[in-house]
Every structure is written in C-alpha cells, then in structure tokens.
C-alpha cells in the first residue's frame, strides 16, 4: 500500500513502474462491499393494457357475437400480439380459440384483424397506445369460433388456378429438374413467397362483395406466378381460364391487398400484369 501511496504523489514513480506491477496495483484497488440497491418496485397496473377480443361460440347460440375485454400485464409478456393471445389463453380464459403454429410469419395460421388492419399476430407488435386494442377475425369470412374463420372458399379459389407446374412436353432429362436461367428465376420473386394467410383477399372490398365469383388477390398472384414460370407450358390456357369479368376484372385496383400483405408482396401489381397480358394475347 506504501507503493500505491507513492504512485499517487509522484508522476515520476508511476513512469518507472513496470507494467506487471502497475496492473497488480490497479487490480488491488478496493471495491465497495455493499450490494447495489434494488430497482424501485413498479406501480401496480403501470404496464397493463386492455385487449377487446371478438368472441362467438357456435355451441352457445343464445349468446351473440361480442367483444370481451381482457387486461394483460405487458411487463410479463412477449412483444407480439400472439404472445398476448397465448398469455390470455394460458392464464385467464382457456376457451379463447385462435389458429397459430410457427410463430415466425411462415405458416400464415394466425392471420386476423388487429386494430383495423389485417396481419399476422406473430409479426404484429403490441400497440404502444394507451387505448384498448381490438382483435377480431379476418373480415367478411364465416366464423367457425372466436378468431377462427372458414378458409374453404379461399383454398378452393387457390386450387382453381391450378398452382402447379403443367407441361405438354416431357422433361429434357427424365427424372431431373427442368433448368431455369437466373433471369427467369428472378421473375418469380415477389410471388413464390406468398404464405396463403388471406390477409390480402379479406382486405379487398371487391372480394367482400363477390367472394364466390372474384378469385381475389392471393389466387391471382399465384396464377401469375405460374404464368411467369418459364418451365410451364400452359400460359395461354391459364390466361384464358381467368379471362372473366368477375374472376379477374372485378379487381378495381384499390390496393388494400398490397397494404395488408405481411410479407411485403404486391398482389395488385401482379393482377395488373395479368390484365396487360390479356390485352396482348
């Protein structure tokens, strides 16, 4: 300790000191033995948010569809809306029903309407607004229970565009892939990423008005995905099959679909591409 006192008084002594001794003296500096004070306790309800969730049970026909409020402590919850729904189901109301699977924006299962916008619950952050958040099913769809909607018509429309490779000739090399150039492969970008969550179609007023005749943004995006595929040999037949005043031309370029897509795709752009191809055919 005498050496340490000398160092504090004499800059010359500090300059002559070896690095090893200097490091030992620095390391020997006493530390406070008193523990750090604990953080102040949070106020009760300081981080509590209300969620108004659509409820309807077909097994209770006397109870009409309604919004039910749940208060959730966000200090003990993940950042996404799906975290809130899971917390409510696990801790408050096990009867709350919704679809979910991957929790990574890949499967499209947890599509719903959150504060007026369609989106995936697993990718939508909890609103920082102090007002209550409203969670409801995808709009203008038949509700099976709570936040679960009937996707039958949506999938039938997807199936109707025959979303698979169709060829008239045998592959150049039987049993092997059909090659594509990088440029041809790039034409599929912005279409193959669709996860069929139905956020786009159920945000479209034209789809609300004509859900059985109009194919909707998702199905038409997939139609164009195969129209643009250089390996497919049924381009004309695909264009002819959707050249209809309802199937295709019921799109009025409102572009709600582009705003709603949780994957950042642009269905309106690809519908416009199909319309231009119809004029050129």
Curated annotation (Swiss-Prot):
Residues 26-48 are annotated as: Disordered. Its main location: mitochondrion. It catalyses: a quinone + succinate = fumarate + a quinol. Residues 1-25 form a transit peptide. Belongs to the succinate dehydrogenase/fumarate reductase iron-sulfur protein family. One of its GO terms (molecular function) is 2 iron, 2 sulfur cluster binding. The keyword Transit peptide applies. It is a peripheral membrane protein. Binds 1 [2Fe-2S] cluster. Binds 1 [3Fe-4S] cluster. Keywords: 2Fe-2S, 3Fe-4S, 4Fe-4S, Electron transport, Iron, Iron-sulfur, Membrane, Metal-binding, Mitochondrion, Mitochondrion inner membrane, Oxidoreductase, Transit peptide, Transport, Tricarboxylic acid cycle. Its cofactor is [2Fe-2S] cluster; [3Fe-4S] cluster; [4Fe-4S] cluster. NCBIfam families: dhsB (TIGR00384), PRK05950.1 (NF004616). InterPro entries: 2Fe-2S_ferredoxin-like_sf, 2Fe-2S_ferredoxin-type, 2Fe2S_fd_BS, 4Fe4S_Fe-S-bd, 4Fe4S_Fe_S_CS, Beta-grasp_dom_sf, Helical_ferredxn, SDH/FRD_Iron-Sulfur. Component of complex II composed of eight subunits in plants: four classical SDH subunits SDH1, SDH2, SDH3 and SDH4 (a flavoprotein (FP), an iron-sulfur protein (IP), and a cytochrome b composed of a large and a small subunit.), as well as four subunits unknown in mitochondria from bacteria and heterotrophic eukaryotes. Residues 184-214 form the 4Fe-4S ferredoxin-type domain. A ubiquinone binds at residue 209. Its EC number is 1.3.5.1. This is Succinate dehydrogenase [ubiquinone] iron-sulfur subunit 1, mitochondrial. [2Fe-2S] cluster binds at residues 102, 107, 122.
């Amino acid at each position: 300790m005498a050496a340490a006192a000398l160092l504090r008084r004499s800059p010359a002594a500090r300059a002559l000191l070896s690095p090893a001794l200097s490091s030992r003296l620095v390391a020997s500096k006493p530390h406070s033995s008193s523990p750090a004070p604990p953080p102040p306790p949070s106020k009760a309800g300081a981080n509590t948010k209300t969620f108004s969730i659509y409820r309807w049970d077909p097994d209770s026909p006397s109870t009409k569809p309604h919004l039910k409020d749940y208060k959730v402590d966000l200090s003990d919850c993940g950042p996404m809306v799906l975290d809130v729904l899971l917390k409510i189901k696990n801790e408050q109301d096990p009867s709350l029903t919704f679809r979910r699977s991957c929790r990574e924006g890949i499967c499209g299962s947890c599509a719903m309407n959150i504060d007026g916008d369609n989106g995936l619950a697993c990718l939508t952050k909890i609103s920082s607004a102090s007002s209550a958040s409203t969670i409801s099913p995808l709009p203008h769809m038949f509700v099976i229970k709570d936040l679960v909607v009937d996707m039958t018509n949506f999938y039938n429309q997807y199936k109707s565009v025959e979303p698979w490779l169709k060829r008239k000739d045998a592959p150049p090399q039987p049993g092997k892939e059909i090659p594509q150039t990088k440029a041809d492969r790039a034409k599929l970008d912005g279409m193959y990423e669709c996860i069929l969550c139905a956020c786009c179609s159920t945000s479209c007023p034209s789809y609300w008005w004509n859900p059985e005749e109009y194919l909707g943004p998702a199905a038409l995006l997939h139609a164009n995905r195969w129209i643009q595929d250089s390996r497919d040999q049924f381009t004309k037949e695909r264009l002819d099959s959707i050249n209809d005043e309802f199937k295709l031309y019921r799109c009025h370029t409102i572009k709600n679909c582009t705003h709603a897509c949780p994957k950042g795709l642009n269905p309106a752009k690809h519908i416009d591409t199909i319309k231009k191809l119809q004029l050129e055919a």
